[in-house]
Each structure stands twice: as C-alpha cells, then as structure tokens.
C-alpha cells in the first residue's frame, strides 16, 4: 500500500484529538484545498473554473472554493440552492444534469444557467420560461461526434448528439429561450496532458461549428473536467504547467474568433480529493484460525469506496477491472496508514456491519494496533461521504470536519 503522504503533523494532531470523542469521521485540510485550488486558477487564467459540488458539498469546503473564486457545477436543484447560499451569481452557476424534472427547472430557472440535456428538456425549459413570462439564456450539453481520444464517439445517456444539436439550432422554435453556450464532458480522471489538450482542441473546434448555426449566441463553452488526481501508487501528478501551455495556445485563437465567449472548466475532485481523510477507530481485535482481524467503526457504510474497490477486484475474472468513475477508481486508490508506530503485523481491516462484504483491506502490513487506535484512509476528500450508504444498519453517520488554516476545526 501507499505510505501516507499528505497527512502532516497538524492533521495527525487534529485526528488524534477528534478520536477522543468520535469513532469515525472525515477530516478535510483547508490549506491543502486552497493550495490545489490556486494551482488550478494560476494554470487557467483565461477560464472560469467551476467547483463540482457533487464531489464534496460539505458547506465549509464549498465555502473555501467560493472564496478561491470558483463558480459552481451543480448537478441538482439542491446544489443550485447551495451555490446561491454561498453568494454565487447566476452567471457563475451551471446546472447540468440529465432528467431535470419540471419542478427542478421552475425552481432554478432564475438562479443558474440551465444546461439542457435533450431536445425534450429544451421544451420543458421553454414551457417554464413561458409560464413565468421571461426570456432566458440556456446552454446545451452536447454529445460530440468524436470520442475523448479522437475517433468516433459512442452512444451516451448524456447530452444532445452534435448532429441533432446543429439541426435544432438551425431551426430554433423556442421563443423564450436563447441558446448561449455549450457544455461537454466525456471523461473523468485523465492523467495525460496530451490527451486532455487534444480533447480541448476538439471541443473548441466543435464549438466553432455550433457557433456558426442560426440561433447560437456563443457566449460560453464549458469544457468539463478530466484532470485526474493520482489514484494508484504508480500515478504521477498532472503537470499543470504543460497543460497550461497547451490550453493557452488553444484559448487565444478561439477568443480572437469569438470575442464574447467565456471558457469554463470544471474542477472535478482535483482540489478536495487528496486533501480529505477518513479516520476510523479500531473497536475490536480478534484472531480467527491464525488470521488477525481489526473491527473498525463506520467502514463500509461510512466510506463505501475502499470496500467496493476490494469487491470489484475480488470478483472480476480478468484481473484488470474497468474503471467506473466515481464509484471505482482502482484497487489501490485509497492509501491506509495509522496514527501510531509499532512493530509490523499482517491484518485484515473490517467494519462493524453485519455483512462479510464489509472489508476494506485484507492481509496488509500495519503497525500493531490495539482497541482505540486510529486508522487513516486517504483520497477521501471527494466522492467519499457523498457516495456512502449511511443508512445501512441504522448506524451513526460519520461527522465531517474542516481543519482550518488557523488550526480550528469547523463542523456543521
């Protein structure tokens, strides 16, 4: 397994303090989040970056991202309301998700830029705007004719096919709506700067094609996310300097042709992901047939993905299970460490649910632990609490805390 890089002495001290009163919890590092957020804004000065609220909507974390100048990538009406509560303006909030209900559309029509996911959804937004007696600008989520790495695109549940979008825009019959921009997202977790640069180039070329249609008033292009964080010991951090250079070379000429078009990128899990940790307490220790088990608090129900990664690896017969973001990012995506030193031993870490599936690591080497000792799981700052089945067995939900730069702990 990985060594526990990133949990500095401040974080370890905060975790040890919380373990006096909590059996399991999420701990987010404000300094780490801000550092990574600023790395993004420095690298893409010509783009507005949207924080992907679905990655981690914990209010103190979302507030940090707002303070760093990020807008919001919202995937629900509730996330739109969260962004508004943080003080974000309508132009900074993009609501892009398939299957928006009429209720969702009515509630958010004047709070965010709605990005229509289908022709039917355009009609529903038109109906809502007509009912309110207003005219609104919207975006269109486009399913490109190309794939992420070039070549022909594949069928998708997301967006309007590029060819269909061109037809719609050349025969626009929605008098209360103006198509003002596009949103594209084809892949999460890409570590290749060259692959991302090619994707950006293809999206901007497509934006030019759509910008030449009758109805499109191209005022924004949202290129989605894709910038990966390391989720395997062999992964290297994305070289943002290389990506910055490639993006600038594309953005400059595009802005020359479309002076009013604003470029957006989505942050995905980049800022909070490596800056979050799940800490759980050893509740019991037992030996069965010579095998050591540590029973910990709130493991599978508190942080699902490590247990899910083990299940996928165990039951996949190929030995190379396909990634399925954000649920499965690889078998070695979550480094495990302890808050104490000691003689090494081989242990299996399980949770306290009444299911044999509640195992997060099997036969790993850790310092010998006793009841009450803490175990730390990394890469828990994004798609962690939001994806976990807290209601399982009616156990207590793990709390979340932000370790502020001042040293204070903030919860909700």
Regions inferred by a protein language model and the residue ranges of each:
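Active-site-proximal loop/turn and secondary-structure-junction residues that shape catalytic pockets
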Residues: 55-57, 78, 99-101, 118-120, ...
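Conserved, mostly hydrophobic/aromatic
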Residues: 33, 54, 76, 108, ...
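Structural preference for beta-strand elements that scaffold enzyme active sites
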Residues: 48-50, 69-71, 90-94, 113-115, ...
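Active-site loop/helix belt of alpha/beta enzymes
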Residues: 146-284, 393-395
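A charged N-terminal "starter" segment
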Residues: 1-130, 134-136, 174, 178, ...
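Charged (often Lys/Glu-rich) extended helix/loop segments that serve as interaction or gating elements
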Residues: 258-412
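Conserved residues at the C-terminal ends of beta-strands
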Residues: 96, 117, 185, 224, ...
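Electropositive phosphate-/nucleotide-binding environments in soluble metabolic enzymes
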Residues: 27-34, 55, 59, 74-77, ...
């Amino acid at each position: 397994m990985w060594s526990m890089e990133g949990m500095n002495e401040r974080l370890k001290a905060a975790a040890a303090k919380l373990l006096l009163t909590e059996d399991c919890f999420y701990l987010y590092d404000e300094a780490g989040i801000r550092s990574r957020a600023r790395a993004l804004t420095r690298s893409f000065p010509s783009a507005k970056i949207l924080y992907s609220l679905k990655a981690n909507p914990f209010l103190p974390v979302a507030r940090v991202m707002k303070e760093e100048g990020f807008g919001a990538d919202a995937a629900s009406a509730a996330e739109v309301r969260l962004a508004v509560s943080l003080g974000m303006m309508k132009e900074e909030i993009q609501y892009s998700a398939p299957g928006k209900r009429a209720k969702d559309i009515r509630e958010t029509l004047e709070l965010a830029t709605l990005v229509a996911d289908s022709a039917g959804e355009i009609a529903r937004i038109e109906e809502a705007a007509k009912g309110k007696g207003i005219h609104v600008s919207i975006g269109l989520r486009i399913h490109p004719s190309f794939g992420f790495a070039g070549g022909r695109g594949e069928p998708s549940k997301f967006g309007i096919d590029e060819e269909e979008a061109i037809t719609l825009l050349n025969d626009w019959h929605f008098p209360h709506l103006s198509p003002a921009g596009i949103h594209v997202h084809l892949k999460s977790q890409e570590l290749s700067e060259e692959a991302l640069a090619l994707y950006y180039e293809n999206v901007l070329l497509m934006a030019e094609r759509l910008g030449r249609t009758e109805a499109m008033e191209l005022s924004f292009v949202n290129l989605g996310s894709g910038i990966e964080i390391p989720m395997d010991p062999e992964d290297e951090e994305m070289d943002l300097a290389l990506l910055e250079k490639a993006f600038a070379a594309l953005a400059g000429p595009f802005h020359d042709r479309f002076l009013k078009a604003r470029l957006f990128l989505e942050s995905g899990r980049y800022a909070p992901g490596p800056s979050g940790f799940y800490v759980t307490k050893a509740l019991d220790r037992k030996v069965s047939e010579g095998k050591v088990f540590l029973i910990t608090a709130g493991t599978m129900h508190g942080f699902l993905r490590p247990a899910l990664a083990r299940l996928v690896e165990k039951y996949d017969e190929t030995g190379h299970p396909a990634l399925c973001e954000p649920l499965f990012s690889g078998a070695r995506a979550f480094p495990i460490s302890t808050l104490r030193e000691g003689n090494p031993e081989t242990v299996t870490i399980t949770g306290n649910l009444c299911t044999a599936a509640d195992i997060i690591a099997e036969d790993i080497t850790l310092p010998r632990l006793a009841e009450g000792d803490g175990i730390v799981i990394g890469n828990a700052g994004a798609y962690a609490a939001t994806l976990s089945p807290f209601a399982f067995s009616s156990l207590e939900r793990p709390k979340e805390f932000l370790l502020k730069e001042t040293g204070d702990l903030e919860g909700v």
